[in-house]
Amino acid sequence: NIIIRLDGYYAPFTTDAFLSAIERGFYNGLNFHRVVPNFVVQGGDPRGDGWGGPGYTLLTERSPIEFNCGAVGMVRTEYDTEGSQFFITLTDQPQLNYQYTRFGEVICGMDVVKRLEAGDRILAISVVTMDER
């Protein structure tokens, strides 16, 4: 399992959209289509090739929190083009700071993240409150 703490303070719209997609089951069964060693794993694309999305875009919500190892951010082609694709950093990535929406961090299961390979599937994502952990 991978447990991600979401940041609704610095990325409220992204967090809301991510939670809404989870509630709809959007991510269940999707794959991690891109794995770049020592950089990121990327998933959340319904097409599975890096070109798909949810049919809407989100505004870029740049935060002052750094992209350290385990940071969760939104994929974009340019500002304000985020959708459903997200990435998890495998190492510290300071060049991403203030450039991408960082909306969460892995708090448990980073060993699992580091073993992911392209094509591995998201079996299911569920929302757990901190009280339920």
Show the residue positions of the predicted features.
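Cyclophilin-like peptidyl-prolyl cis-trans isomerases
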Residues: 1-133
